[in-house]
Amino acid sequence: MGKMNHQDELPLAKVSEVDEAKRQWLQGMRHPVDTVTEPEPAEILAEFIRQHSAAGQLVARAVFLSPPYLVAEEELSVLLESIKQNGDYADIACLTGSKDDYYYSTQAMSENYAAMSLQVVEQDICRAIAHAVRFECQTYPRPYKVAMLMQAPYYFQEAQIEAAIAAMDVAPEYADIRQVESSTAVLYLFSERFMTYGKAYGLCEWFEVEQFQNP
């Protein structure tokens, strides 16, 4: 990897003020470092993924094959397999999307957040919304406030959300996703797999109206 070689050469870049003994010491250090840190490319890859996860971003496999990294396909497959087999990288997880494989670190990103991010990256808005709604209804359980789709990790526009909900209304795979509004006209979505309409309405009414009347 070009970046790694460049870093190796940094200590020797400006040697005009370094005396001969130190220069020889630096040069002598290079060879054992190169051999001792043979697994370093996998470490660099894992660290790259961890840093992006900390910033809330998935790393697509294609990133490593593209400039400025340009890792060869065969080499990348070996590196990713070594990461998978090495306990030091047990936090590095992979999600397979319809367009690519995506990597993230479980130290910085939950499986649910990663799954949501994957759908956003692949611009599958209907599936992203359905995943969020079903997860909310099954896990907490509570209906999902539509306004949340305009926040992280989605940042969907209002028009995108409206179009997606309209498409979901007629798509068989999203037949369980239903709309419910509070008496103050705040829109929520819920999944009939995990919640009845009455339960969803009662909860959204509590969130939007009743909790403020009964502190």
UniProtKB/Swiss-Prot annotation:
Induction of the gene: Up-regulated by the oxygen-responsive transcription factor FNR under anaerobic conditions. Repressed in the presence of nitrate or nitrite via the two-component systems NarXL and NarPQ, respectively.
Designated name of the protein: Uncharacterized protein YdhW
